[in-house]
Amino acid sequence: MGTKDGKGIKILAAIGLIITTIIWGSAFVVMKNSVDIISPTYLLALRFTIAAIALILVFWRKVMKINKSDLFCGGLLGVFLFVSYFFQTYGLKYTTASKNAFITTLYVILVPFLHWFFNHKKPKRNNIIAACIAVVGLALLSLEGDLSINLGDLLTLICGFFYAVHIVFIDRYTTDHDPVTMTVLQMVVAAALSWIIAPILEGPFDGRVIDNTMMIGLLYLGIFSTMIGFLLQNVGQKYLTPNTSSILLSFESVFGLIFSVIFLGDPLTVRLVAGCAFMFAAVILSEYRKKTAS
């Protein structure tokens, strides 16, 4: 029996991914304040570094057992992760936050086809329809104003593509490798790449901008949003298909909306409620035929 067959473990894995999206959704509030003070790539470097150090301290026994195969697979996942975050961050400089959020989550529609391409597993019809419904929901949640295409949109589309690749390869590598080990290596590689790129693009880092309040925000991003969030994603994806995982992870937009309404005072409109309804419908449809077939 494969790791993706047990109902109980699949439910726990799905709950883990939902918790991840709640954490990531709340991170929008923290990021909104942090990016105004710390430049984007240095912010990535700090959050990935905090996560990497914390993971190594907690799971040092697993770190001591890392082999060459782990290094290759985890390192490649780290590259995909860094590239997706890098292009999302710089895409945001040239486009609106709403378009950036929407285009990033187009990985929902890309994952079934990339999973087919890389792993030779053809997506079921209900998975494709569910992904399309999720895109409609994401559009209702994210898009507003000018819908023209600009440089920022293209950069963000690259982000969405690499995040889709990241999801597909997590599915591939966590089948034969420990997901915790994969998470540790991803954080280390993403942190290293961030520290290499940041000085080139943004000059030397000014540590004086980090006060006590900023440190609390950085610790939240590093420990909760990055360490715990990606740990739950990597472990959860071991027991779920990439198609199901991508739709569940896209709920980051739903929880981002909820936290923005609660903490930032953003208005809750009928359009946003409809977007949430489409998202829930996509999840139900993505699993419906599996249940009737069992």
Report the location of each language-model feature.
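Glycine-/small-residue-enriched transmembrane alpha-helix faces in small-molecule transporters
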Residues: 1-42, 79, 87, 147-172, ...
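C-terminal transmembrane-helix exit sites in multi-pass transporters
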Residues: 54-63, 107-129, 254-273
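Juxtamembrane helix-entry segments on the extracytoplasmic side of multipass membrane proteins
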Residues: 8-14, 37-41, 45, 66-72, ...
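Hydrophobic transmembrane alpha-helices of multi-pass small-molecule transport proteins
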Residues: 55, 77, 123-143, 163, ...
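Helix-helix packing/entry segments at the starts of transmembrane helices
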Residues: 44-46, 100-106, 170-192, 223-262
